[in-house]
Amino acid sequence: MLDNTRLRIAIQKSGRLSDDSRELLARCGIKINLHTQRLIAMAENMPIDILRVRDDDIPGLVMDGVVDLGIIGENVLEEELLNRRAQGEDPRYFTLRRLDFGGCRLSLATPVDEAWDGPAALDGKRIATSYPHLLKRYLDQKGVSFKSCLLNGSVEVAPRAGLADAICDLVSTGATLEANGLREVEVIYRSKACLIQRDGEMAQSKQELIDKLLTRIQGVIQARESKYIMMHAPSERLEEVIALLPGAERPTILPLAGEQQRVAMHMVSSETLFWETMEKLKALGASSILVLPIEKMME
């Protein structure tokens, strides 16, 4: 029996978002011992329970108030939302923030030897998918009628097996489509992981813990998107150096022992520092350029 005084977070047990969700919670300082077969894990240092479930169960658990928070792909969340609305329900939840992992796209794909002149080419065709509601919404907007073939896995084999004329499935690299003689022809939905919260009254202690967790998640994401940069630079060219690092805060300037014309610069940059930028910095006279990852960050 779950303790209602503890914050309950649902994450994917295994699959595309599982490892990233676990890593995010760990980097937020939540100590969890996740055994392979254990579906509920208790945090050692916070009043938090982690429920490891199928990804398509997570939206319902949040909408039904069984758990307080869920980490889920926007594609799965939107599909469940459309499904419940189609059944006359009014699902409630809050999206707290989009996360920086789990990026994918839901796309239409057809056999490589078939011509494509837009969604109208699918009129009257049978389309295999695990996302019937997202597919219907998109093709309804295009005025295209179709027959749905619902599959919960191996969608890409449907055309070769004679089950469908085309598919609508998640795509990351496109390699699986190519291996099955298909080509991506239209993106209908772009998705990332997100953190959602149940609707309804929340105990003050739980809400305070959620707010703390959100602050830490923001710090983790900022740290992943930022770099700590150190270099030596000519004193007279500091503004030119700073201009090459858009998104950087004003740097810390430190004197160099025995140097009058050069200083040490330390800064946090929210921009990716490419080799080309480093070469331009060097051309301005910068040296000893170090670009370091940031583990934690709080503004």
From Swiss-Prot:
Cofactor(s) needed: Mg(2+)
Signal peptide: none
PROSITE patterns per record: ATP_P_PHORIBOSYLTR
Subcellular location: Cytoplasm
An example Gene Ontology molecular-function term: magnesium ion binding
Cross-referenced CDD domains: PBP2_HisGL2
EC primary class: transferase
EC number: 2.4.2.17
Sorted UniProt keywords: Amino-acid biosynthesis, ATP-binding, Cytoplasm, Glycosyltransferase, Histidine biosynthesis, Magnesium, Metal-binding, Nucleotide-binding, Transferase
One GO CC term on file: cytoplasm
Any one of the GO BP annotations: L-histidine biosynthetic process
Similarity-based family: Belongs to the ATP phosphoribosyltransferase family. Long subfamily.
Name of the protein described by the UniProt record: ATP phosphoribosyltransferase
Gene, per the UniProt record: hisG
